[in-house]
């Protein structure tokens, strides 16, 4: 599908107003679709779709990830950590890093000689905290999160109000920035493909 932005735009083209698809055994028509935006940063939802059937309407809020994407959050700041993990973010990170503290103690702080990609004379000032969906090297470990907390991270449930209640096509829509589905398949060619291949975030976390 090419680059990430182009892939998102292509999915939105599939989901243009008036497009029909079958979801949970019922036929729906797209009433509104767009990419949620906010003043600073980004919501978790990449593609917002409001569709209706003859019986009801449904909000489909997709977080789109490339199949080879490793990072959930790269070079995380304190502000971003609180948004992802909630008010207990310090304890969560502290407990998770303490679980692998021996790995940190084994690392040199001052490099008298070069080592791997570290140059001679380098001094370790600290480490950056990154959240990945798989093991990422010598200093990686499993985050000590409950299933519900993992769902919150993927969905963006703890994000700030402006990111949760994002703007879609000029309209502020409540919780439009909180994703409820994830799509990791780049091989989609129609609206129905998108619907068939997206996975509920809660189900994805439990896989």
Question: Where would I find each of the regions flagged by the language model?
Answer:
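A short acidic/basic microdomain associated with nuclease active sites
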Residues: 17-53
């Amino acid at each position: 599908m090419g680059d990430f932005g182009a892939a998102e735009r292509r999915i939105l083209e599939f989901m243009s107003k008036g497009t029909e698809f079958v979801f949970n055994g019922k036929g729906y028509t797209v009433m509104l679709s767009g990419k949620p935006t906010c003043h600073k940063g980004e919501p978790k939802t990449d593609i917002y779709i409001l569709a209706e059937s003859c019986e009801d309407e449904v909000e489909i809020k997709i977080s789109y990830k490339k199949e080879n994407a490793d990072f959930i959050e790269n070079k995380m700041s304190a502000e971003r950590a609180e948004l992802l993990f909630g008010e207990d973010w310090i304890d969560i990170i502290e407990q998770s890093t303490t679980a692998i503290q021996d790995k940190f103690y084994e690392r040199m702080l001052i490099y008298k000689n070069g080592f791997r990609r570290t140059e001679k004379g380098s001094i370790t000032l600290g480490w950056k905290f990154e959240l990945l969906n798989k093991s990422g090297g010598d200093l990686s470990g499993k985050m000590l999160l409950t299933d519900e907390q993992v769902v919150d991270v993927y969905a963006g449930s703890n994000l700030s109000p402006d990111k949760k209640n994002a703007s879609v096509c000029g309209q502020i829509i409540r919780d439009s920035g909180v994703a409820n589905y994830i799509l990791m398949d780049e091989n989609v060619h129609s609206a129905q493909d998108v619907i068939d291949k997206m996975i509920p975030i809660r189900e994805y976390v439990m896989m």
